[in-house]
UniProtKB/Swiss-Prot annotation:
Keywords: 2Fe-2S, Amino-acid biosynthesis, Branched-chain amino acid biosynthesis, Iron, Iron-sulfur, Lyase, Magnesium, Metal-binding. Pathway: Amino-acid biosynthesis; L-isoleucine biosynthesis; L-isoleucine from 2-oxobutanoate: step 3/4; Amino-acid biosynthesis; L-valine biosynthesis; L-valine from pyruvate: step 3/4. The keyword Transport does not apply. The gene is ilvD. GO terms for molecular function: 2 iron, 2 sulfur cluster binding; dihydroxy-acid dehydratase activity; magnesium ion binding. The lineage of its organism: Archaea, Methanobacteriati, Methanobacteriota, Methanomada group, Methanococci. It holds the Pfam family ILV_EDD_C. It catalyses: (2R)-2,3-dihydroxy-3-methylbutanoate = 3-methyl-2-oxobutanoate + H2O; (2R,3R)-2,3-dihydroxy-3-methylpentanoate = (S)-3-methyl-2-oxopentanoate + H2O. Disulfide bonds: none annotated. This is Dihydroxy-acid dehydratase. Belongs to the IlvD/Edd family. SUPFAM superfamilies: IlvD/EDD N-terminal domain-like, LeuD/IlvD-like. It comes from Methanococcus maripaludis (strain C7 / ATCC BAA-1331). [2Fe-2S] cluster binds at C119, C191.
Length: 550
């Protein structure tokens, strides 16, 4: 065992003494050491309940003959960080989490890990760190939040973000907005729709890294405690059998995750996180081109918020990810999982599917997959749109650019009534390096939707979007403005041509004009001169490469 390097032999007497100071016995030190990676925090609703899950995991580890050691990572709430400088730290925190998991597990000689994340960057960050070690690990995600209810209708956090736009145009009163605020988030869990946190939980299960149904069991459900305990027991088996993550995470496993993502219409942020996870196995193992290629294999089969009327609780009650795998079994590759059964065996074991929520492939919500990669002179390396959450009338759109060099400028313009039907809002210098940190543009997109402009106004950016964004929002434009991408050359009034069916995005300018404009631009000056974001800005790769540190 790896932990023998910490605990075996006369020379390790000082090491054992320190462990005994923590309450561990000689008997404990004969067993596999299992790191239990928690991300509990009192700031994030998706993480406020994770102490209960970590205790359940540790019970499972003990019961099956392992010795658990709990430690924590950070966890940032994108919703609380949204709309201000704090959002610049959200995506970069993924790399801090990965480094923390790698450092703690390697330094203390753990034989296996149980990862307990919930929210957006914490899920991929923990997986990335664990993959660097290539020791057995299982993920038990914290689970979705239940939706709230306002005046007889379900609501959740995005209802509030869009409510701000509705208030600005007089659709609702401040009192009504306050009433929604009181009930939109009723308790623990990740936000109730298929936003980034829940998208990543679903893809983690599809990758084979979580036990079946884990992704959709809700935070307040006792089933979550039971599956946490089962996960703790299972990791001891994986350590004894030496089942490494690279035995599970084959190219085919990543393709399964992408197929599920495309079929469900997951968050566009998955196109950052899945390549970043794969990059820990092999450089450019998975790229945007894989998302593009696989989008031809599956339709959009589930109408879940923000692209539909259902919530995560509906997906769970419809059969969860095993049911999705069952519906897609003609496309799914047969791969290993931490459960011990193969992906197709799990799919075949499903006894019930609600086809009103998880549609059959022959009767989908949309014929096209839920995510789409666009390329053209505006984004030679690609950009991404959640087409499953776009009004079909906006699949093709030509319009004049309204250009803003930050999210803050754009929000002021939107709320100030400076955007009219037909416009294409361009928000630039918000990419991984330029932002820095690639902020999510949920505030502007929600304002557009709340004001009723989402079927007539498009938004493109080298930043990214919340999983809760809907409408014709095209993000991750690569190369970014700070790297001299074409988006830096766009001027007010330039015609932007968007064709989501043809997978194209272009600015209607001759190449010579683009080159001339780019040649006249001043060299990009980093916005932040010290601290973590300064280092991040210098080291981060492009969005089309997963925004990983070089």
């Amino acid at each position: 065992m790896i932990s023998d390097n910490v605990k075996k032999g006369v020379i390790r007497s000082p090491n054992r003494a320190l462990l005994k100071a923590c309450g561990y016995s000689d008997e404990d030190m004969e067993k596999p050491f299992i790191g239990v990676v928690n991300s509990f925090t009192e700031v994030v609703p998706g993480h406020i309940h994770l102490k209960t899950l970590s205790e359940a995991v540790k019970h499972g580890v003990y019961a099956n003959g392992g010795t658990p050691f709990e430690f924590n990572t950070i966890g940032i709430c994108d919703g609380i960080a949204m709309g201000h400088e704090g959002m610049k730290y959200s995506l970069p925190s993924r790399e801090i989490i990965a480094d923390a998991v790698e450092s703690m597990a390697r330094a203390h000689g753990f034989d296996g890990l149980v990862l307990i994340p919930t929210c957006d960057k914490i899920v991929p960050g923990m997986i990335m760190g664990a993959l660097r070690l290539n020791i057995p690990f299982i993920v038990v995600t914290g689970g979705p939040m239940l939706p709230g209810e306002f005046q007889g209708k379900k609501c959740e956090l995005i209802s509030l973000f869009e409510g701000v736009g509705e208030y600005q145009v007089g659709k609702i009163t401040e009192e009504e907005l306050k009433s929604i605020e009181e009930c939109a988030c009723p308790g623990a869990g990740s936000c109730a729709g298929l936003y980034t946190a829940n998208s990543m939980a679903c893809l983690t299960e599809a990758l084979g890294l979580s036990l079946p149904m884990c992704a959709t069991i809700h935070a307040v459900d006792a089933q979550k405690v039971r599956i946490a305990k089962k996960t703790g027991s299972k990791i001891v088996d994986l350590v004894k059998e030496d089942v490494k993550p690279t035995d599970i995470l084959t190219k085919e496993a990543f393709e399964n995750a992408i197929l599920v993502d495309l079929a469900l219409g997951g968050s566009t942020n998955t196109t950052l996180h899945i390549p970043a996870i794969a990059n820990e196995i092999e450089n450019k193992f998975i790229t945007l081109d894989d998302f593009d290629r696989l989008s031809n294999e599956v339709p959009h089969i589930a109408s879940i918020k923000p692209g539909g009327e259902h919530y995560m609780i509906d997906l769970h009650n419809a059969g969860g990810i095993p049911a999705v795998l069952n519906v897609l079994k003609g496309k799914i590759r047969d791969t290993k999982t931490v459960d011990g059964r193969s992906t197709l065996e799990i799919a075949e074991s499903v006894k019930y599917i609600n086809y009103d929520v998880i549609r059959k492939v022959e009767a989908p919500v949309h014929e096209t997959a839920g995510l789409r990669v666009l390329k053209g002179n505006l984004a030679p390396n690609g950009c991404v749109v959640k087409i499953g959450a776009v009004n079909p009338k906006m699949y093709k759109h030509d319009g004049p650019a309204k250009v803003y060099n930050s999210e803050d400028e754009a929000i002021s313009a939107i709320l100030g009534g400076k955007i009219v039907e037909g416009d294409v809002i361009v928000i630039r210098y918000e990419g991984p390096s330029g932002g820095p940190g690639m902020r999510e543009m949920l505030s502007p997109t929600s304002a557009i939707c709340g004001m009723g402009l989402d079927d007539s106004v498009a938004l493109i950016t080298d930043g990214r979007f919340s999983g809760g964004s809907r409408g014709p929002c095209i993000g991750h434009v690569s190369p970014e403005a700070a790297a001299g991408g074409v988006i830096a050359a766009i001027e007010n009034g330039d015609i932007i041509k968007i064709d989501m069916i043809g997978k194209e995005i272009n600015v209607d300018l001759d190449e010579s004009v683009i080159k001339e404009r780019l040649s006249k631009l001043d060299e990009f000056e980093p916005k932040i001169k010290k601290g973590y974001l300064s280092r991040y800005s210098r080291l981060v790769s492009s969005a089309d490469e997963g925004a990983v540190l070089k």
